[in-house]
Regions:
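Signature of short aromatic-glycine-proline-rich micro-motifs recurring in repeat-based ectodomains
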Residues: 1-3, 46-64, 108-125, 174-194
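Conserved beta-propeller blade signature
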Residues: 5-8, 67-70, 133-136, 195-198
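Short loop/turn segments immediately following the C-termini of beta-strands
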Residues: 11-12, 21, 73-74, 83, ...
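Beta-rich catalytic cores
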Residues: 12, 54-57, 74, 90, ...
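Surface-exposed loop and turn segments in beta-propeller and other repeat-based domains
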Residues: 28-52, 90-113, 157-180
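Blade-level signature of beta-propeller repeat domains, shared across WD40, Kelch, NHL, RCC1
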Residues: 142, 187-212
């Protein structure tokens, strides 16, 4: 549930389904279908190139009352709608690609703080004072990216990186052994208050960080 709506990433059908009244009754059809022109279609990126209203592998959702974020892992990006959509429409916000038509997998080499390789999870947390933090599991780069505040369209890259020595590095377990500050294919995460939990799938463990 994000805000008052219940959202489901229907990954294999390349769409996100939304129920505006919260948890639906059994067999209740969705009120909103994002990523496809109708409830019967299921093509990757609507059968064409990536755009602001398409998905390849939508895998996770987060947000708040007036914002929905979707981790579109297959297009190596995070899409955002503000306010939350009440019908199929293009996204307003974009992270991980230079424009809405981009879906390039960054080549395996030195990386940056504003590109992803298969971001499978995203989480936005708001503190009692109204401040926000955003976390993205940049899965194939074996790292977690963090922003102080919700970045806007065209804003700079992440403020912090976990599990790598710098933004350019992306090795599995830092190309060393499994350690307390390494990750191998982080696949899920949850950010609440001062605690970040990460499903470190390649190392068969869950890692916890506490902000000090």
């Amino acid at each position: 549930v994000v805000g008052g709506a219940f959202w489901v990433t229907d990954t294999g059908n390349r769409r996100v389904l939304g129920w505006q009244g919260g948890i639906p009754e059994p067999d209740q059809p969705a009120d909103v279908v994002l990523g496809q022109p109708d409830a019967e279609s299921r093509s990757e990126n609507r059968g064409g190139p990536a755009g602001p209203d398409t998905f390849r592998w939508p895998h996770d959702v987060t947000g708040r009352e007036d914002l929905l974020l979707v981790a579109d892992a297959g297009d190596h990006r995070v899409l955002g709608w503000t306010p939350q959509p009440d019908a199929d429409r293009g996204a307003d916000l974009l992270l991980g690609q230079p424009d809405f038509g981009g879906a390039e997998e960054w080549p395996y080499g030195p990386h940056t703080n504003d590109r992803f390789r298969f971001p499978y999870a995203v989480c936005l947390d708001r503190a009692q004072d109204g401040s926000e933090r955003l976390a993205v599991a940049d899965t194939a780069n074996n790292r977690i990216l963090l922003w102080d505040g919700m970045p806007s369209l065209g804003a700079g890259g992440a403020d912090y990186v976990l599990a790598q020595p710098d933004f350019a590095s992306n090795g599995e377990n830092r190309w060393t052994a499994v350690q307390r500050d390494t990750l191998c294919w982080p696949y899920g995460l949850s950010l609440r208050g001062d605690t970040l939990a990460v499903a470190d799938s390649g190392n068969n463990r869950v890692m916890l960080w506490r902000r000090t």
